[in-house]
């Protein structure tokens, strides 16, 4: 009997110790109470940048390569210059975000990733700190692929239009007016510089841009990772919008996400080349060249670069260096004729 009592006492002690240990252990995390997803919201400045980009692409791509006089050339140069270069590149990311929002699977993936207010704020902070974190969200790859294809299509459209304008710079030289010196060259250059420093206010609303993006059916794809910085940042901004964290109160975080130094450098170089070209251009056909090559083709190439897709090949003239012909051997010197005695 003593052994039985001792056995029961041991069991009782073990049970009590288990209760004590369980009481000292960590508490189970509280389940996050799901809340109604917020409305998708984009700050007005994002809408303005996306609209400015959309207006520029559509306006510049529609420039006709057919010119009948110098006035038409001047108007085309002015139309192509009327936007700040940095705004174009931030507009790439802003418009890309709107394109990503049209991927319903991605939007659902973002909402499933963060179901409560605290989780949404935490995920948004994570995306602001490192936009590439968005690639862990379900559906992000498909959204990124769509953004890459749409931006590439925009850039190629502008590039091809510029190529046609550039060709017309050679074709139009058959017409006398094209060889006349541009009127007020100094004023024309100053005007182009001032226009390219102005932030363009777009009249396009968020609804207009969403409708435009929804109608895009880009060819090609799907595009696989790795994605370009601009594409990833576009998708990250879209995710923050789904989380309700891309409104006016989040301008600082959004501004940090919408910075791609590689594309900003491309835009600055395009602007520099445009100004240098216009500075030395004299006849109207040279202005047409500046318009086609720099304002249009170079800008289009920057957008394609932002998409991460293959940039168009542009052959450049490389003169053939031919070896000098070997010099003919000198004829042997003739002996002087003997003097007659």
Feature locations, PLM:
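Alpha-helical transmembrane segments
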Residues: 15-18
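Secreted, short cysteine-rich peptides and small extracellular cysteine-rich domains stabilized by multiple disulfide
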Residues: 250-314
């Amino acid at each position: 009997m003593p052994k039985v009592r001792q056995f029961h006492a041991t069991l009782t002690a073990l049970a009590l110790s288990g209760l004590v240990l369980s009481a000292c252990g960590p508490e189970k995390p509280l389940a996050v109470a799901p809340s109604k997803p917020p409305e998708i919201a984009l700050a007005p400045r994002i809408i303005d940048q996306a609209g400015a980009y959309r207006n520029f692409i559509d306006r510049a791509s529609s420039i006709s390569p057919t010119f009948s006089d110098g006035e038409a050339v001047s108007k085309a140069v002015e139309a192509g210059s009327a936007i700040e270069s940095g705004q174009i590149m931030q507009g790439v990311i802003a418009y890309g975000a709107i394109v990503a929002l049209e991927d319903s699977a991605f939007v659902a993936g973002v909402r499933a990733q963060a179901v409560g207010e605290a989780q949404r704020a935490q995920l948004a902070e994570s995306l602001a700190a490192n936009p590439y974190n968005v690639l862990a969200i379900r559906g992000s790859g498909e959204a990124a692929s769509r953004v890459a294809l749409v931006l590439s299509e925009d850039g190629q459209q502008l590039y091809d239009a510029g190529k046609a304008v550039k060709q017309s710079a050679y074709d139009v030289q058959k017409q006398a007016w094209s060889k006349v010196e541009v009127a007020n060259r100094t004023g024309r250059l100053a005007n182009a510089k001032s226009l390219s420093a102005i932030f363009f206010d777009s009249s396009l609303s968020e609804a207009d841009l969403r409708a435009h993006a929804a109608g895009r059916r880009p060819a090609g794809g799907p595009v696989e990772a790795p994605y370009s910085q601009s594409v990833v940042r576009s998708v990250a901004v879209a995710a923050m919008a789904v989380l309700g964290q891309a409104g006016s109160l989040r301008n600082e975080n959004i501004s940090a996400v919408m910075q791609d130094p590689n594309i900003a450098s491309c835009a600055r170089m395009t602007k520099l080349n445009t100004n240098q070209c216009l500075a030395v251009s004299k006849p109207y056909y040279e202005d047409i060249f500046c318009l086609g090559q720099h304002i249009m083709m170079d800008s289009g190439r920057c957008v394609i670069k932002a998409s991460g897709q293959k940039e168009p090949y542009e052959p450049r003239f490389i003169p053939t260096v031919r070896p000098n012909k070997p010099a003919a051997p000198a004829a042997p010197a003739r002996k002087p004729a003997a003097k007659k005695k």
